[in-house]
Amino acid sequence: MAEDNSWKTSNFRQSVVNKINEAIQQTGMTSSKNGIEMENHVFHKARNKDEYLGFVARLILHVREMTAAAQQAQQDGGGNSSQQGGGGGGGGSGMPDPINALQNLASQGTRPQMMGQMGVGPGGPMGGQMGGAGQASNLLHSLRPQMQMGGMGGPMQGNRVGMGPGNQMGGMMGGPNQMQGPGAGMVGGMPGQMGVGMGPGGMSGGKIQMGVGPGGPNQMNPMVMGQIQAQLQNQNAMGGQQMGTVGGTMNAGNQMGQMVGANAGMNPQAMGMASNQVVRQQQLQQQGMGQVQMGLGPGQMGQLSAGVQGGVGHGGPAMQQQQQAGGMGPGAGPNQMNPGVAMGPGGVVGPAGGGGVMGPGPNQMLGAGGAGGPGAGQQGNFVGMGANAMVRKPPEMMPGGNVYPGSGGAVRSVTPNNFLRQSPSPSVPSPVGPGAHGPPSHPGQMIPSPALIPSPNPHMGGVAQRSTIGQSPGGSLNTPGQPGGAVPSPLNPQDEQLYREKYRALTKYIEPLKRMIAKMENDDIDKIAKMKRLLEILSNPSVRIPLETLHKCEAALTSQLGSIRETPTNNPLVEAVSSSLQAATGNHTLQRTFRPCLEALFGPDIKNLPPPAKQSRLALDDTGAAVGTGGGEIPHILQGEIARLDQKFKVSLDQCAISGTRTIKLICWLDDKNLPCVPPVAVTIPEDYPSTAPSCSLIEQEYNATPFLILVQKSLMARICKLPGLFTLSHLLDTWEMSVRQACSPNPTIVAPTGTSVLLGM
């Protein structure tokens, strides 16, 4: 399969930058680097899309963990750390485990069809793994809207939570009956012990079941409490989105009372349903259903407010699913307005297709978003999932999909940006309409109500009022918000107009800033980094920054670049010309561009000029080329002959010649790279040349200097004697060259020249 390079596109990278900036704003962390620099570092470090998304998830986890410790210390007072060891290893402080989260990301990126498998190995703490991997998986899905689960045999599409075609949440791909193995079911069925069993059969095929034994809802052992508390603490730590900590903090001495709210006057009907719910859970476990069931009553489910509530039912006729927008059961208190997020295959929990907590009677049901019999194909509660739907799938996947009991496992479907506020009135819109059928047309339809209304429920007094409804998962809103606060209203029109005018005024600095960065390429690195940061702010209008920051940018740019006037109208032309001149074809481009304009202005070049007078041509090296002896011109015949001479002969006028005569004296040199250098010869051209042959004379002092030159002189004299009566300058110079060649031969005197040999140049 071809490698997916969509993560390298500018639009995809910009969405990642927006999410990083959003996480920084929500946590209130101050960083020396902005989102663009962080994303650029991650982009160059990653080799493929999975690594890229994994690094981004780790980065955002790190940003959120920076403030998680301080917030958790304030909320819990340090009393919850002793309850964190229940998941087979304990999370200590409930902090997310980024290593498991990133391993989970890698497996999710390569096998989206197996994202619903819930194989948790022994020793995996429910709180730490669920919190860290939940955030990371939510981040991954928010970055990958295209992985928003495919079809499930009909209209059940928009809410598939990492499910393969086999409609399983815990097994490999295949039918729902593949959930087999020695660990199936609630092992031992021990009272009060957290069991995570995978049923070998049933129509829901191996979903996680987390049941509480018949010890009573207020007597959960520390293991269960630690795991639930770890979930809640992780939720509290995510950007200040505090939810699910019903009644404030949870202590070992009051483990279940504050969570359920029983110590604060919980209605007896919900309390009575809690124990019945536990019995029902054990029945479901023995049947191998394996659905996600937290051992809490419906009232507790409502108070958990979109925590890890995967309520499912058997789907019998007694399961009267109620299509209520707020999800209130008939016997539940006002604290049950928000339904648990049902995490079934495709959002359909159990064969009945509803997404609530379904007990054996109608009074034990928390309202789900849809009703119908088996195979109804309805959408479950699509609570803020959109592109952020996730299913925890740790890397310790057991063969056959078995989950070891006691290790802890959780399904988490609420992203940090999509926490639901508890609503006191049904008039506040639900995340989805009641009984929504068919896949949602757009994730934007699933934005929960932005109403920030405090709940009148006394049991929710400990829940911090900063839990908010985040932005749409796929949205790239860039409005700055305070950490953990509600989405602020947009700026008033006056401030918006001031911001736009100031930004437009600063755009004139973009080009000078680019040129300055190019000039300072090898200079001060810190200064270049500041300049690049300013350029990023000016070049990215989608990122909103405070108006004070714009004023600071303007002051810095003014100090660096000075006051820049408005761009002149001809500036683009000048820049285009300067860039064209730097190219190799600059002159050609200029001529092709401006010649028609110049011809139109000044007319074409003057044509049909009179032919210039024929000038005398003589290949002479000095200024006396056209100077004839006695003031006359050099004959044209002689000029033509000199012009046609071989390039190895260099001819010039003799400057020492006596003026007043009509004869022409020339000095000739032989310049051949294959012959030795010899002194020049003096040639006298008579007045009636070519009727009279020229004469040649050698400078005796020079040609008598060495035996070689003496041999050249003798050979030349012998050859001249063999020349015919009328010969030309060309004949004379060729004879001179042959004399030099003969002197250079090993046996220069063996062959005497003859008239024929001399004429033939031999």
Curated annotation (Swiss-Prot):
Biased composition (Polar residues): 465-481
Keyword Cell membrane carried by entry: no
Highest rank taxon of the organism: Eukaryota
Alphabetically ordered keywords of this record: Activator, Nucleus, Transcription, Transcription regulation
Gly residues bias locations: 76-94
GO cellular-component term (any): core mediator complex
GO MF annotations, alphabetized: transcription coregulator activity
One GO BP: regulation of DNA-templated transcription
Location(s), subcellular: Nucleus
Chain residue ranges for the region called Disordered: 70-102, 311-330, 406-494
One protein family per Pfam: Med15_M
Subunit structure: Component of the Mediator complex.
Summary of the function given for this chain in its UniProt record: Component of the Mediator complex, a coactivator involved in the regulated transcription of nearly all RNA polymerase II-dependent genes. Mediator functions as a bridge to convey information from gene-specific regulatory proteins to the basal RNA polymerase II transcription machinery. Mediator is recruited to promoters by direct interactions with regulatory proteins and serves as a scaffold for the assembly of a functional preinitiation complex with RNA polymerase II and the general transcription factors.
Listed PANTHER family: MEDIATOR OF RNA POLYMERASE II TRANSCRIPTION SUBUNIT 15
Similarity comment: family membership: Belongs to the Mediator complex subunit 15 family.
Name under which the protein is recorded: Mediator of RNA polymerase II transcription subunit 15
